[in-house]
From Swiss-Prot:
InterPro entries: Tetraspanin/Peripherin (IPR018499), Tetraspanin_animals (IPR000301), Tetraspanin_EC2_sf (IPR008952). GO terms for biological process: regulation of calcium ion transmembrane transport. It comes from the Eukaryota. SUPFAM superfamilies: Tetraspanin (SSF48652). Residues 41-44, 94-167 are extracellular. The gene is Tspan13. It comes from Mus musculus (Mouse). This is Tetraspanin-13. The lineage of its organism: Eukaryota, Metazoa, Chordata, Craniata, Vertebrata.
Length: 204
């Protein structure tokens, strides 16, 4: 059967949702791995990653069930939710790619000041103290603070990687944004196709 028929649309939609399922399980696994190995101690960061993973898993599950059963209501809600996710993700991805170094620094400083546990993780893993300057009276978990070695500030070290990370996140986000708009198009098309095995007198 040529691609574009009922079976092809169904198989493509199932494959797309299986991909989303794998990505969601990967996100949850990475968060659990980070906590298990002590790389991340911020429950807020881990909670956000796990919440995104669960949300993506539920969306994929709805899409998969709707595709397998050709369920009109599930497919409709799946299409609407996927469209909303596309709009948000596309906007965030474009923002990540558009940030200049000054804006990146301001964003990093806001995050630094509002996440104490993540701040401690960064200082410990990168062996630096303070964002732009280090106050010896402040508590710092970095090894340099416990020795005679001079501690450098974290802003220059984080800044080296921030641009690359934002470009990577923006690129990955754009890729998945286009898979989501593909999913919306496939779902719309699949909903309006008639199952060849169904009763010929039935409506779709």
């Amino acid at each position: 059967m040529v691609c574009g028929g009922f079976s092809c649309s169904k198989n493509c939609l199932c494959a797309l949702n299986l991909l989303y399922t794998l990505v969601s399980l990967l996100l949850i696994g990475i968060a659990a791995w980070g906590i298990g190995f002590g790389l991340i101690s911020s429950l807020r960061v881990v909670g956000v990653v796990i919440a995104v993973g669960i949300f993506l898993f539920l969306i994929a599950l709805v899409g998969l069930i709707g595709a397998v059963k050709h369920h009109q209501v599930l497919l409709f809600f799946y299409m609407i939710i996927l469209l909303l996710v596309f709009i948000v993700q596309f906007s965030v991805s474009c923002a990540c790619l558009a940030l200049n170094r000054e804006q990146q620094g301001q964003l990093l400083e806001v995050g630094w000041n509002n996440t104490a546990s993540a701040r401690n993780d960064i200082q410990r893993n990168l062996n630096c103290c303070g964002f732009r300057s280090y106050n010896p009276n402040d508590t710092c978990p970095a090894s340099c603070a416990k020795s005679t070695q001079k501690c450098s500030s974290c802003a220059p070290i984080i800044g080296e990687y921030a641009g690359e990370v934002l470009r990577f996140v923006g690129g990955i986000g754009l890729f998945f944004s286009f898979t989501e708009i593909l999913g919306v198009w496939l779902t719309y098309r699949y909903r309006n196709q008639k199952d060849p095995r169904a009763n010929p007198s039935a409506f779709l």
